Curated annotation (Swiss-Prot):
Localization of this protein: Cytoplasm
GO-annotated biological processes: DNA recombination; DNA repair; SOS response
Classification via HAMAP family: RecA
UniProt name for this protein: Protein RecA
An MF annotation (GO) of this entry: ATP hydrolysis activity
Length: 357
């Protein structure tokens, strides 16, 4: 009898808790609007993270979802002339191919329109702003994000977001932490509206050296620590060597490390070629990734695809793939399939979802 009473009491308590929760949820929805709180799996399954290609097949694979995630903050940093702006312009071009609206906040006042055009950027559709102060730049970003009409915003660069107080002050005045405070406030304001609007914001950043570091890495990025915490993906891009045609340097070999990734496993590395005036070499990636995936066979210095020899030496194989886009497309499809990624884009523009890793 006592056991039955205890079970009955526990049952009533559970019912009371359920009613209290239902009442609290109803009050929250009345106060903040329908959809302000819900059960994660209710009504519809969890949405797949939409991604935009980086223009590099190897980097898309390393990121785990086929590109950079939409509705998130991204940081791309590295030394000077390492390919940071080139990589972001490729992302802009890929987003424009899907019909997305892109904006470029050029705080450095150094964007080369002709180079952007060569990388596939549609200049007629690209929104560009060259703000005078850091506050103005971040207000422009905030306004564009809140509009819900922009799919991708690039800020080049965090180091050039100079606070108004520093610009109005004299040369040599100490402005301790003013840029870090500015970035911290901007991250707090932007992060919620970025998620709601599904707009990707890419911050390009520069590297500085810490003074007096004896052990460990002395490198750090500008703008304080806020961006490091709020960024879903952080990419470290480095130039590792030169590509030469006889005595002429025609490009760089570049390594990118996924330092932070909230949507897939981090710490993956990828190497690709950046050719001057051309950008990321897609054919070079197809040769290298094709060999790794077993799609392209390498015997000595010869490269073969199926029964067909495609070139002696890497540069000749690249030239063959440039001249034969159908073969290049077949190799690309097989590389993608071998990594379990569905890169196909449907009519709604949603693709690049992780299928099976």
């Amino acid at each position: 009898m006592a056991t039955a009473n205890l079970l009955d009491l526990n049952g009533r308590r559970e019912m009371d808790k359920a009613k209290a929760l239902e009442s609290a949820l109803a009050q929250i929805e009345r106060q903040f609007g329908k959809g302000s709180i819900m059960k994660l799996g209710a009504n519809s399954p969890v949405m797949e993270i939409e991604a935009t290609s980086t223009g590099s097949l190897g980097l898309d694979i390393a990121l785990g979802i086929g590109g950079l995630p939409k509705g998130r903050i991204i940081e791309i940093y590295g030394p000077e002339s390492s390919g940071k702006t080139t990589l972001t312009l490729h992302v802009v071009a890929e987003e424009q191919k899907k019909g997305g609206v892109c904006a470029f906040v050029d705080a450095e006042h150094a964007l080369d329109p002709q180079y952007a055009k060569k990388l596939g950027v549609n200049l007629d559709e690209l929104l560009i702003s060259q703000p005078d102060t850091g506050e103005q730049a971040l207000e422009i970003v905030d306004t564009l994000v809140r509009s819900g009409a922009v799919n991708l915003i690039v800020v080049d660069s965090v180091a050039a977001l100079t606070p108004k107080s520093e610009i109005e002050g004299d040369m040599g005045d100490m402005q301790m932490g003013s840029q870090a405070r500015l970035m911290s406030q901007a991250m707090r304001k932007l992060t919620a509206s970025i998620g709601r609007s599904n707009c990707m914001v890419i911050f390009i950043n520069q590297i500085r050296m810490k003074i007096g570091v004896m052990f460990g890495n002395p490198e750090t990025t500008t703008g304080g620590n806020a961006l490091k915490f709020y960024a879903s993906v952080r990419l470290d891009i480095r130039r590792t060597g030169a590509i030469k045609d006889r005595d002429n340097v025609i490009g760089n070999t570049t390594k990118v490390k996924v330092v932070k990734n909230k949507v897939a496993p981090p710490f993956r590395e990828v190497e690709f070629d950046i050719m001057y005036g051309e950008g990321i070499s897609k054919t070079g990636e197809l040769v290298d990734l094709g060999v790794k995936a077993g799609v392209v066979e390498k015997s000595g210095s010869w490269y073969s695809y199926g029964d067909e020899r495609i070139g002696q030496g890497r540069e000749n194989a690249k030239a063959f793939l440039r001249a034969n886009p159908t073969v290049a497309g077949d190799i690309e499809d097989r590389i993608r399939a071998s990594h379990g990624l569905d890169f196909s884009t449907g009519e709604d523009g949603k693709g690049d979802d992780l299928v099976d890793m």
